[in-house]
Amino acid sequence: MRSKASSRLLATALLVTSLTVVTPLAPVSASTTDAAFNSGTGALNVNYAGYLSKHDIVYNRINTNALHGLTVGNGRTGAMVWGQNGMTMQVSGVDLAQQSAYAAGLLNFTTSPAMDSSFSTFQQRLSLYDGVLTTKYDSNRTVTIMGSPNSEVMGIHVDDTRGGVSSVSVNLNMWDPNSVQNVADVPNLTTWRTVSTFANANAAGFSRGQSDPNNFGYTFAATVEGAGFTTQVVNGTQVRLNITPTSSYTIWFTAASRINSPGLNSVTQAQNQLNSVKSTGYATTLNNYKNWWHNFWARSFVQYSGVSGDADYMENVYYLSTFMIAAGGYGNYPLHFINGVFRATQDQTKWSNGYWYWNQRDVYNSFLASNHVDLLAGFNRLYSRNFNALRAYTQTRYGTDSLWVPETMGWDGNARGTINSDYVNDLYSTGTEAAYNMYLQYRYTNDLTYLRDVAYPYMREALRFYQNRLQLIDGKWQMVSSNSHETYWDVRNAITDLAAVRLLAPLTIQVSTQLGLDNGLRAGWQNLVDNLWPYQVGNGAYLPHDPPVSQTRNNENVALELVWPYDRTGIGYPDYQTAVNTWNVRPHPYGNVWSNDHAHAARLGLGNQTLDGMRTMLQKYQNYPNGMTNNTNGVFEYLGIHLTALNEALMQSYNDKIRVFPAVPSDSSFVGKFTLLAKDGFLVSSEREAGEVKYVGIRSQYGNQARVVNPWGTQQIQVRRTSDNAIITTVSANEVTFATGANTVYVVERTAKPLTNYTATTLTGTPNNGQKSLRNTASILGLNAGGGGGSSVVALRAHANGRYVQAANAGAAPLIASVTAIGPWEEFDMIDLGNGNIALRARVNNMYVCADNAGTNPLIANRTAIGGWETFALIRNSDGSVSLRAQANGRYVVAENAGAAALIANRTAIGPWEKFDLIPR
């Protein structure tokens, strides 16, 4: 989950961006008398182009902050784009390096005169439906960034009808290769610090990692279609394409991975890829690329709207998160939870040099329900392809012919990140999670071959590992010592181990019987189930291990693993109240960027808490207008777990029962609609408005038996086959079970108000054209046209004690309200950053004031540039005073201890100590 140096994790738990006051999203028009279900297709009628356009991310001013760059990718290669010296992007690829740790390089596109000179209108739009990033300057300049599907190639198409353009150039460059650190556990760091360039009549580029013993490495190269060009090597880390100005042309670029190249020759592969896409041409490639994304979106649908716009924002983040993960999720290796394919930090990564299962499951597990099992399959392949290596290492480490899976694993199954870490070196339950995800892949695809050849062997060997580790004491199988995930070390009967066995053993027995394999092993497995040590309960809630509670080492809510992803309890289970109690008293509410409290709330049917949890996570961690985070502990986890929470709020099938709208808000304005995939291949659709569920539509893909929880309690319902309107069954019960035919559509409806009572409709939306905000938080998506408005010189007088704030010790010490007169140490440049945000620069040392360590340390003037920690929302109070809210953590600045202590951003509300007079100088 995270590095051994966990102290920094807690320091960054609260990270929020600047306050922006924007009108909340308006709910999508809805009607309680219509329905969008298509009885022929078995899905909702959706105008996807129109509907998804309302979730486009729009920048109405040029963004020069690399960390706020918009993201575009084709599944294997991604680019993060911002405006700097023209248009700049950092290009990354999934398969370029171990754990995607090293990026490809920077691409800079410039013209003379500049593309962004002399314009009156500007808009940059990320179209989620098309997967295209379009930048328009007036009506005579458009830059379209897109990709070639199922390849590593992306393109920049330029339409520029201005006269007088004298030059156009594209630079591919690499940052200082000597700055590269071994963040990927590579065996040869020198080859990653070695750059080789080339330039010929057809393309130019450079390569790194060409001698990597693990066969990673890449070539970053570009060519041009539709215009003449020359190429040159500028220096040892930079190449350039000089393009003859014309009104329309396309720049193609690729990050060709060595490991996927014939003969490991990424230079030849890059040139072949560029020649191929150039031969296909821009128009055809763009059409193919759009169709690839259109087909992706057509596989599922969610609407989660209303509640004063809060739910709409959750829905926007849902689609944006889905896009960002999918845009890098189709490589040979999984999208890494930190590195991914979208970053603007060169080769700098955060803290992990491996795949951490907890974090990766956050990213991937939602894609079963959203009908993108192929994405989860890529995650599963990382573990299944290393099956033999992991078994061999299990024999070496534990002396048993079975399967232990390290929580922190390298691309090749190595456990170097696990065995030397106290957090994970005695963590045993990861193998069960990996095996269970493979089993679920079977349950959602009906792929019996995959079950027999891949999933079942994994299940069997992971269970046999537990047989080897458990000890029979006083007639009960017990785990004498292991980690209860990362939070409790070397404890007795970790709840994760007990849950793992209770999950895996019955399933393995069932599959063994189904396949007719390993009959002689089943009795031993059943003995585990029958005699396993019970979970421990204290004060009505599950304990993470046998008492007494061990020292807390991390901020996971381990006991709730029973709820998700171990699927051991939930709505309708005998221990439901115990599970709810466990959620209510969990020790670390939303404690980190990978927290899954809201997914647990959804599984427990806590609808209001689920919405509040999604909102809380975004308030804390969605800090940038592109949807990304400034959290130092992760990147993609909070996006992926948001998807899980929202899917589980709308539909659940984990316990082989289809349950619709189990955890939606109680607010009557909430509107929910979806088409999602349930276990056993049922495509489920339903709509809920004004508190009423209209119907449940089911398309059976494989002809399995369906079991549906009656969403109307025990009102009489019927199951109707839509092809001939035959009534399959009628019941007045809280569940209905019925046989289905493959590729056949059914409707579960009230006999008193069947689906035919509703008029048909198609869901659509209106294109977004501006910035969106999450009500009463600093989280925004997109940028308004307004910008900063200069600076002024001010002093601050604290209401707490009537004294002036000074940058003490000439700025070397924290800010404190301690002096009675204004001098050089008390003067600050107040810089208007736009959207109600400011920065303060101390005149005494010309340094910016920082809410240091994400706001956990006092304010101090010691930064040379403005970032998130140096940004404050300026709040003007009704009495004429002002307050400052730190972007770093969303807390108000206080003159602590009535001004006797340093200023610090740690208050959640404004009182006298949080007020200051702004004194112009």
List each language-model region with its residue ranges.
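Acidic/polar, glycine-enriched structural segments that form the non-catalytic walls/loops
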Residues: S31-L67, V72, R76-W82, G86-N353, ...
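Lectin-like carbohydrate-binding module/patch detector with strong preference for beta-trefoil
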Residues: G787-R921
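Surface-exposed beta-strand/loop patches in extracellular or lumenal glycoproteins
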Residues: S166-W175, G697-G713
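Carbohydrate-binding surface patches
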Residues: P149-D160, D680-R707
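Sec-dependent signal peptide cleavage junction
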Residues: T20-T32
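Acidic/histidine-rich catalytic neighborhood
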Residues: E461-V511
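Catalytic cores of secreted or luminal carbohydrate-active enzymes
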Residues: A101-T110, F636-S685, E689
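Active-site core of glycosidic bond-cleaving carbohydrate-active enzymes
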Residues: W356-A392, D412-G413, Y423, L427-L448, ...
